[in-house]
């Protein structure tokens, strides 16, 4: 069945585009990534500068918009927040965040538990993923991006 309706892409098509592009800048040098972030008019906080792992999500969204002409805010947000998550994530954003977290190339300690939680649904998957991330970063004494904490609190609020 055709998924394109008018000029709007369905969630499956948008997930495909965001999934292909979410790591488009991951292998680029940090200086190249930061240049794209600046070119897109985004400002990095001091914390984001210290957390190099978030560069590729920010630069990836910038690249998708500036070089590929992608204007769909949901696709851009799915790329932009696939590492940190954020409060108020759309369905597409949650799908890309969790798909990245449980992809076949992931081999962290609790990956099988994480995959099982995602199989239960988005809400259990998001709760487990964010709890795991915050706990793991805290255990290592590493900084936790405020968007991740906000996402965790948002998921917690939605659980009731």
Regions found by a protein language model. Name each.
Residues 1-6:
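Single conserved hydrophobic/aromatic residue that forms the stacking wall/gate
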Residues 7-8, 12-130:
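Divalent metal-dependent catalytic cores for phosphoryl transfer on phosphate-bearing substrates
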Residues 135-160:
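Charged phosphate-binding loop/patch that engages nucleotide di/tri-phosphates or the phosphate backbone
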């Amino acid at each position: 069945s055709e998924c394109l309706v008018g000029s709007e892409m369905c969630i499956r098509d948008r997930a495909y585009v965001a999934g292909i592009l979410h790591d488009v800048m991951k292998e680029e040098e940090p200086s190249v990534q930061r240049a794209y972030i600046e070119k897109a008019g985004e400002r990095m906080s001091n914390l984001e500068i210290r957390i190099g792992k978030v560069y590729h999500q920010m630069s990836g969204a910038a690249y998708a918009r500036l070089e590929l002409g992608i204007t769909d805010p949901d696709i851009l947000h799915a790329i932009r927040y696939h590492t940190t998550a954020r409060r108020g994530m759309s369905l597409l954003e949650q799908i890309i965040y969790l798909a990245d977290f449980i992809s076949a190339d992931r081999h962290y300690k609790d990956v099988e538990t994480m995959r099982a939680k995602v199989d239960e649904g988005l809400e259990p998957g998001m709760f487990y993923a964010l709890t795991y991330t915050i706990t793991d970063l805290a255990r290592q004494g590493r900084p936790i991006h405020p968007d991740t904490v906000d996402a965790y609190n948002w998921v917690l609020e939605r659980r009731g």
